[in-house]
Every structure is written in C-alpha cells, then in structure tokens.
C-alpha cells in the first residue's frame, strides 16, 4: 500500500521533532556555566579570607568551579561581623563567571565565645546580620561550618531559624559536616540545608602525634559516603565529597601542615604518591591519582566535590583542580 506524499512529509517532520526532544532531554554533566543547577556536578572551593580577599580571588580559576565559599566571616566578641572587606567585589567577580558565592561561618578555629551567639538575643542579631550580609553583598547564601563543641544542643534551633530567614530572601544555606561528629547532627538540623559537604579528611593530624599516618585515605571517603548516604539517608543530590589540598607531617622536623603547592616546591615529582619522607619525618597527603580516584567516586555516588582550600593548589599540569576538572569532563 502506498503512503500519500503529504502524509510521508508529516511523518518525517514528526520524527525530527521526536529526535530533537530526545536530545534535549538527555542529562549532561557540566562543571562551568551552570551555577550549580540540578543536573550539574558541583565543584565547591573554599577561599581563605586573609589579608586581601580580592587578591586571593584573582588567583582562582573560576572556569573549573561552580561555587566559591569565603572562609570565614565571623562575629567579633561584640557581635559585629568581621572580614567583609572586598566581599561585594568578589561576589561580582564570581557571578560574572557564573559561579555562586557563599560566606562561610565558623571554621575549625572559630572563636571560643561562639556558643553565646547561638542562643537568645545574640542569636537573633547574628541571624539578622548574616541575612543582611548575603543580601547587601549579593551572595547566594550562607555556609555553616560549626564544628566540634559548637554542634551543641542549640545548633538545631540555630540552623532552623537561619534557614527560615535566608529563604525569605531567596538565599541558600549549606553546611560542612564531618563523620567524627555524626552523633551531634540531628536529622532535623540536616534537613534544613540545601546540601551538605562532607569534610572527608583530618582523620589524624598534629593534634594526634601518637597517631601518625594518612589523614584522608581513599577508604575514608568510601566510609564517609556509606554513612551519610545509607545510614543517615541523605539523598545523593544533597551531598558532596570533601578533598584536601594539603598534608600533615609527623616525626623529625617534618612540617606539621603543608600545602600541596608547598610539597611540590620541594619535591616536584611527588604528584603521584600520597606520602613522602621529609626532614627526618613523614608527610601524608593526597597525590593526583588519589584525587582523581576520589573525584570519580563522587561522580558515581554524590553530586559534587568540595575543596579545602583553593590557594593550596599549584597551576599547570600538576594542578589538583585541573585533575578534578579532567575527571568531570571525562578526560
């Protein structure tokens, strides 16, 4: 039976439309130009808030990250936020590169008086100031990196109230979490965050001189993901895996802490190993193969990677950020 010519033409047009629709519906994994959208793989880089935030930001390869976290902005003893110089300019720089920017509070060295700002009138003021900070400086939100004793009985109510206040202004809230503090995080607190970043490092360090060894082995990354995905049931799209751009030394005259960049300055060929002899001691870190393997693990199991911290990297072919980017792009 012959098909009329007009009908054939209609069928041909219909098939073309179907093909185009199918092509548009395919999900692709991208790292740049996505702003951290639902189909993107997040690459979150912490930028230390030192003497010149702008100078630090100018060293960042924005084409290889999706989120920039300024670490840290905290209240002084009177409750006034510090470290806000150049924040608006850096936010404009990030947004011009289609990168989201957050201010991170707390940190491993947060002030000892911090617990008093998680309750009462001080809490209300801090939340108001953080929301205003995000709005006034065109930030995308606030990252909560309260650690150790700061994850106390007041943590849950603090993040609930902060999340509510931020969302009224269409701002995000995220958190840095570590499995060592797993029992201190309530499910209700974790549910407030848009996503959380697992600090899968610092298993040991200078504070544990009797426990020398790797502080961020690949096995730790696997164990951390297993716990937060399977035991705590956090969806994969709300998790990222933290990667360290630094190492710790034990014994002899090895440095207590050293950046990846610092390691390469002394031993340029140490990129493919995770430990090295230095000054009569041992330094443990993640070399490029381990960073590549962890990034692949994150691609398979969660929605991104988090980096502490960007200025500890080197440039060129030995760059850790470049290695991460290569894995994401399938190179």
Language model features: what each stretch is:
Residues 20-23:
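C-terminal motif of bacterial Sec signal peptides marking the signal peptidase cleavage site
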Residues 68, 103, 144, 196, ...:
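Conserved, mostly hydrophobic/aromatic
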Residues 78-85, 128, 148-267:
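Substrate-binding surface in catalytic domains of secreted glycosidases
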Residues 29-134, 213-214, 218, 226, ...:
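Glycan-recognition patch characteristic of GH18 chitinases/ENGases
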Residues 25-27:
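Bacterial signal peptide processing site
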Residues 2-11:
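Bacterial N-terminal signal peptides that target proteins for export
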Residues 47-49, 72, 103-107, 146-148, ...:
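A cross-domain feature marking catalytic cores of carbohydrate-active enzymes
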Residues 236-301, 322-331:
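Glycan-binding loop/region signatures in secreted carbohydrate-active enzymes
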């Amino acid at each position: 039976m012959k098909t009329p010519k007009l009908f054939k033409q209609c069928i041909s047009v219909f098939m073309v439309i179907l093909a185009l629709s199918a092509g548009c519906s395919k999900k692709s994994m991208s790292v740049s130009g996505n702003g951290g959208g639902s189909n993107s793989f997040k690459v979150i880089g912490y930028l230390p808030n030192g003497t010149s935030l702008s100078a630090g930001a100018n060293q960042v390869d924005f084409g290889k990250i999706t989120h920039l976290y300024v670490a840290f902005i905290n209240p002084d003893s009177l409750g006034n936020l510090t470290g806000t110089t150049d924040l608006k300019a850096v936010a404009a720089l990030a947004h011009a590169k289609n990168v989201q920017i957050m201010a991170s509070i707390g940190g491993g060295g947060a002030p000892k008086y911090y617990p008093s700002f998680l309750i009462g009138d001080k809490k209300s003021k801090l939340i108001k100031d953080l929301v205003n900070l995000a709005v006034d400086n065109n930030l995308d939100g606030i990252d909560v990196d309260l650690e150790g004793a700061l994850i106390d009985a007041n943590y849950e109510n603090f993040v609930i109230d902060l999340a509510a206040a931020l969302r009224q202004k269409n701002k995000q809230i995220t958190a840095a979490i570590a499995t060592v503090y797993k029992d201190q995080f309530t499910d209700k607190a974790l549910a407030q965050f848009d996503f959380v970043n697992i600090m899968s490092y610092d298993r040991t360090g200078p504070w544990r001189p009797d426990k020398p060894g790797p502080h961020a082995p690949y096995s730790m990354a696997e164990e951390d993901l297993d716990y937060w995905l399977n035991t705590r049931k956090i969806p994969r799209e709300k998790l990222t895996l933290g990667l360290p751009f630094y190492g710790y030394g034990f014994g002899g005259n090895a440095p207590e802490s050293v950046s990846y960049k610092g390691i390469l300055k002394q031993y340029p060929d140490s990129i493919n190993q995770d430990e090295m002899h230095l000054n009569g001691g041992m330094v443990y870190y993640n070399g490029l193969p381990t960073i590549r393997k962890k990034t692949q693990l994150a691609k398979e199991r969660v929605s991104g990677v988090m980096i502490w911290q960007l200025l500890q990297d080197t440039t060129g072919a030995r760059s850790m950020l470049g290695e991460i980017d290569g894995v994401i792009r399938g190179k």
